[in-house]
Structure formats: C-alpha cells, structure tokens
Amino acid sequence: MLKDKRTQKNSQRRRSTTNKTSSEPDEISNLKDSQKWTVNADSTMLFRYSAITFNGHKIHYDLPFSQKSEGHEGLLTHGPMQATLIANRAFASGLPIKSMKYRGLSPLVCQHPFDVEVGKDQDLIIGRVISSKNKITMQAEFTI
C-alpha cells in the first residue's frame, strides 16, 4: 500500500513538472552580463565524472545498456555534472554567492553539444543548461 502511494505521488510530481516546463527556453538575453558557454560532453568526460563521484549507473558510460536496456537515445549527462557546469559559470562572475538551488528538468543526451547560460537578475544569478534540441534540462538559482 505504501509503495503504491509513493509510486502514485512520484507520477503526479513528474506530470506537474512536465506541465510547468516548456521546451522553449525563456529569453536570458534580458539578464545583466549574461554568458553562454557551449560544452561538448563525450563518453570519456561522463566516465571520469562517474568515477570521481562514485556513480556506477551504466546510463552514463555504457552506450548499449543505456540504449537497449533503458531506452535512451544515448549516454545521459549526469544531473550534478550539469549543476557543476552552471556553478562554474556563476562563480566566474566574481560575485559573492551565498547559496545555490538547482533542479533537473529532463534528461540530457551527451552526443550533442549543449549550452550553459548564466545571467544576473537583481540579487540572483540564474543559470540553465539547454540541449541541442533547445530544451532546458537543468536550471539553477544563486543568491548573491
């Protein structure tokens, strides 16, 4: 019974997240000092990130497993890796960051370049990862 309620709750959460998220990114160009960085993650980068974070999930480094067993288009880029890339750009601003919140929105396949965008909005730094299909996969907010 408890498992059924948890499964139901997770399904509702996924549906509400999907409804809130648009495949088209909001404009970031209106943010002060916005920066865009293109990253081309490859299987070696994902394997190394898996190793240093002790993440043994095969969707990050075993292409046949990711495609055949899990049904993904390719290897998936780690959520925390995306958050780390956003944080790297945010800290490069030189502004004193007090806190960070991030949220994964959708899977990011590693075989295509993706963009990391960061910009300032009042007392926040807003960051996100945008896939080659123009879909936001990760968003972050930094309090300054």
Residues of each region from the PLM?
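Residue-level detector of solvent-exposed, low-hydrophobicity positions
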Residues: 4-9, 54-56, 61, 68, ...
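Tryptophan-centered motif/residue detector
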Residues: 1-3, 54, 65, 81, ...
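HotDog/MaoC-like acyl-thioester-processing domains
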Residues: 1-41, 108-110, 117-144
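Hydrophobic beta-strand-centered segment that forms part of the acyl-chain substrate-binding groove
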Residues: 70-73, 77-126, 132, 139-141
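Hot-dog-fold acyl-thioester-processing enzymes
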Residues: 29-93
